[in-house]
Amino acid sequence: MAAEGRVQRVASELQKVISLLLRTRIKDAKLASATITEVDLSKDLSYAKIYYTCLAIEDAEYIDKAFEKSKGFFRSSIAKSLSLRIVPNLKFIYDTSLDYGMQMEEKIQQALEADSKIIKQDDKSLQENYKQNDKETKAEKLR
């Protein structure tokens, strides 16, 4: 259990260090615009999957290549910043969860709009039925 806590703490520190490096040391504007969303670290701390996202989806491929070229820089900077026996091998992965979440949000909005239209149609039908029933009731009373 203690090992899992350490893994989480080191992963959190890796995320902070890489985010700071992106903001302060990276001159490539597209790469610097990437946001680190999560770090998944192996139990032995030797491998790290760094999940990132970017505002412009069309830049994702460029950013992926830039991260690949910059792995050495990130590893050496991590070694200087954190006192780890082994600096993990880094694998940068585009995080699709935000895109997926946005697609789901869009589908939910479409479903809500469709439901709203159905409810409006049902309300109109009910009102017409009430009017018809009122007319019939009045006609019966007059007889």
UniProtKB/Swiss-Prot annotation:
Pfam families: RBFA
The keyword RNA-binding appears for this protein: no
GO biological process, any: maturation of SSU-rRNA
Region span, Disordered: 123-143
Alphabetized SUPFAM superfamilies for the sequence: Ribosome-binding factor A, RbfA (SSF89919)
GO cellular component: cytosol
A GO molecular-function annotation: ribosomal small subunit binding
Protein keywords: Cytoplasm, Ribosome biogenesis
Compartments reported by the entry: Cytoplasm
InterPro entries, per the entry: KH_dom-like_a/b (IPR015946), RbfA (IPR000238), RbfA_dom_sf (IPR023799), Ribosome-bd_factorA_CS (IPR020053)
Family recorded in the similarity comment: Belongs to the RbfA family.
Function: One of several proteins that assist in the late maturation steps of the functional core of the 30S ribosomal subunit. Associates with free 30S ribosomal subunits (but not with 30S subunits that are part of 70S ribosomes or polysomes). Required for efficient processing of 16S rRNA. May interact with the 5'-terminal helix region of 16S rRNA.
Binding partners and assembly: Monomer. Binds 30S ribosomal subunits, but not 50S ribosomal subunits or 70S ribosomes.
Xref: PANTHER family: RIBOSOME-BINDING FACTOR A, CHLOROPLASTIC-RELATED
Name listed for the protein in its UniProt record: Ribosome-binding factor A
Organism field: Francisella tularensis subsp. novicida (strain U112)
